[in-house]
Amino acid sequence: MAQINNHEFYGLDTAYVEKHKELFDFFESQNLDVEINDDFTELKNVLTSKDKDDYAYKFDPTFESYLDSATGFVLYLRYNNEIVATYAAKKQSLPTFVKDMKLVYPGNYETIDDFPGQSAYSSCQWVSKNHRGKKWGRVLDHLKKNLCFDLMKCNTNFAIHKSDLRDYHVNHLAYSNSKRLAIIPNGDVGGAGEVIDKEYWIAYSSVTEWADKQSEVKTLYT
């Protein structure tokens, strides 16, 4: 297994790998290389090139606009050099995210209080249909949270999901909270749902909540 560092500001160096040894040992046991980069255009090309049965969603418009490399990152898992899983995250406040979401996806929105301090939004989770059921996506999500908290120094990581995936986000991705965010009549929210999906939730964890879950989440890596 190798760490591939193609990011201008954030890297997976030896000290960082040792800090999260159990997590990286899992990737090594699966013969996976882990890449961090800041090429969001390539990420879009990877996801939009997939057939509907491999990636069912439109690309998340949050990652369409210009992104400063210092405020976000892309993660890939590679198997025999093929990209087999993705994730992305960027610094963004909840009010800004919701304001932008309302412009693209009109609907009935709940009021959710802003998070204290800097927050990070994450999306674009995908695992190749040929490699699902191996815990790769779940463990990559955990690495993404660690990077948001450790390297980007965020206090909260949040994501949105369709209502059917609430259990997955809370009990498998180990977010500490999930609240209903909006009813979107047209559905089809990029990175989160298809046309049939009308109800969307926000899942989130603070850095303290994530630290308190470490004993629990590390059992996934064995």
What are these regions (language model features)?
Residues 1-59, 114-118, 125-130, 149-222:
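Terminal substrate-recognition subdomain of acyl/acetyltransferases
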Residues 61-64, 73, 106-114, 143-146:
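Short secondary-structure capping micro-motifs at structural edges
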Residues 64-75, 94-99:
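A short helix-loop-beta-strand connector motif used in the catalytic cores of GNAT acetyltransferases and
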Residues 71-86:
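Conserved beta-hairpin
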Residues 77, 89-91, 127:
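GNAT/GCN5-related N-acetyltransferase fold signature
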Residues 88-94, 140-145, 163-164:
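Amphipathic alpha-helical scaffolding segments
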Residues 88-121:
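Conserved acyl-donor/pantetheine-binding loop and adjacent beta-alpha core of acyl/acetyltransferases
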Residues 132-148:
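Conserved acetyl-CoA-binding loop-helix of GNAT-fold acetyltransferases
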